[in-house]
Amino acid sequence: RKSYRIPFTAIPLTRNGTIGFQVENAMAATATGWALGLDWSVIEKALAGFINDASTAPGRFNVFDYKGATLIADYGHNPDAMQALVQAVDGMKSIRRSVVISGAGDRRDDDIRQQTEILGQAFDDAILYQDACQRGREDGEVVALLREGLKHAKRTKRIDEITGEFKAIDLALERLQPGDLCLILIDQVEEALAHITRRIAETA
C-alpha cells in the first residue's frame, strides 16, 4: 500500500505543526479529500493554499504583527476554546504574554470563570472588558466573574478592567514590546478586526 506524507511546513495553517487544532483541521480535510477519491496532488495543493486570516476566516486565530509583537485575534468564548488557544500559544515564542477578554453573558457562571482560570495559568497580564451586549447580565457582572476566575492565577499578576472593547484593545497595544504576544478575544468580530487593522496600518 502506498503511503503519503505532507510536512507541516507545507501547510501554513498549522504554523509548522505548532497549532494543535489547526493540525486536526488539516487532518480532517485530508481524510475527507482522500475519502472522496481526490488525487493526492490536489489535496497537497489545497493544504498548501489554506490561509487563515481576517478576510478568509475572521475571528479564527487571526495572527498579526504589531511593532515586532505578535497579535492573535480569536472569537473563542468557552473553556474548551481557551484550552485550545493556550495550547496553541504555548507553541509560539514570546517574552511576555497578555490577554484581552470579555465573556458572553448567556453562559453559565462557571463557564465564564473557567475561561480566566485557564488563561490565568498562561498569561502575565489580563485586560477584562465589558462587551457591547451583556445578554441579560447586569453591568459589571461578567467582568466580576472573569476576575473571580483569576483569583488563584499562577501566572497573571496584572489585571485591568475596561469598559469598551476598542479601549481594551488599545490599552493592550500601548503596552506591547517587541517579542511580546497578545491574545485578543474579540466580541464584535468585523469591527474589532477592522480596528486592529487600522492600528497596525498607523505604524507602517
Model features per residue range: what roles?
Residues R1-T9:
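Acidic-glycine-rich active-site phosphate/pyrophosphate-binding loop
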Residues P12-I19, A28-S41, K45-A204:
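ATP-dependent carboxylate-amine ligase
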Residues Q22:
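Conserved phosphate-binding catalytic cores of ATP/NTP-utilizing and phosphoryl-transfer enzymes
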